[in-house]
Amino acid sequence: YDIQPDMVTLAKGLGGGVPIGALLMTEEVALKMPKGGHGTTFGGNPLACAAALAVLEEIEGRNLLQHVSEVGNYFQEQLRSI
């Protein structure tokens, strides 16, 4: 569909069970955001950040995004054949 979001929110899966949330945005949106305008009292918790880093390293190290794409394509093909 060639859709490019301006913002994406992440949560549960990012921390592998440790509570965390994140907001990803384009540079254009980020430049319009006031400094500290999206912060929280709990933002930057070291344990949550370490957990998120470990999850991201696993995703990258195991090439999981490519695998998800391949499995998704296979799943769609199988559904179409029904």
Briefly describe each language-model feature range.
Residues 1-82:
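Conserved N-terminal phosphate-binding loop of PLP-dependent enzymes in the Aspartate aminotransferase
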